[in-house]
């Protein structure tokens, strides 16, 4: 039947086939919280929020802010872990740490230098592990970066693999 409106008429004999493809991970920040939470990983079971093994209170606070921010995107079950980096044996690792506590192998993945003030947030892939690294010299910058990632409208504007976050933004 013809209908002047922009509607599709579905009858009892209509057959619909709907397909979707899983996008490749582009390592861009606007995709956050993907791949930490996705259709293939709805409860975060393949992801971990990790702090340095020598974590202090500021690192733990920022990590908890990230966990809370992702809570709305998780399915009813939350299987994502909060752990020390040495225990983060997951495919996707969201790392929060002060530069002085960050292992050299993670610092070597960064393509930009960690600023003296503020934080560097960068998506990188190392082998089979996808990382979101949040590294700062100042404690307050870690919470500021976590607040940025908890704001979906700000994250949607980050069409790059890294950004700098200033304290007080």
Which residue stretches match the model-derived regions?
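Solvent-exposed alpha-helical segments and adjacent loops
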Residues: 1-169
């Amino acid at each position: 039947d013809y209908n002047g409106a922009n509607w599709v008429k579905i009858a009892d004999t209509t057959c619909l086939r709907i397909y979707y493809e899983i996008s490749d991970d582009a390592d861009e920040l606007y995709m956050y919280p993907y791949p930490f939470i996705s259709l293939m990983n709805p409860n975060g079971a393949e992801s971990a929020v990790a702090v340095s093994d020598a974590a202090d209170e500021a690192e733990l606070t920022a990590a908890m802010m990230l966990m809370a921010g992702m809570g709305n995107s998780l399915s009813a079950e939350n299987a994502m872990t909060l752990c020390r980096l040495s225990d983060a044996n997951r495919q996707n690792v969201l790392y929060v740490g002060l530069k002085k506590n960050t292992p050299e192998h993670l610092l070597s993945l960064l393509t930009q230098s960690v600023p003296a003030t503020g934080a560097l947030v960068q998506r990188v892939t190392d082998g089979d592990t996808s990382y979101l690294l949040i590294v700062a010299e100042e404690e307050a910058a870690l919470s500021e970066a976590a607040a940025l990632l908890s704001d979906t409208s700000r994250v949607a504007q980050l069409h790059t693999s890294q950004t700098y976050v200033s304290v007080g933004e």
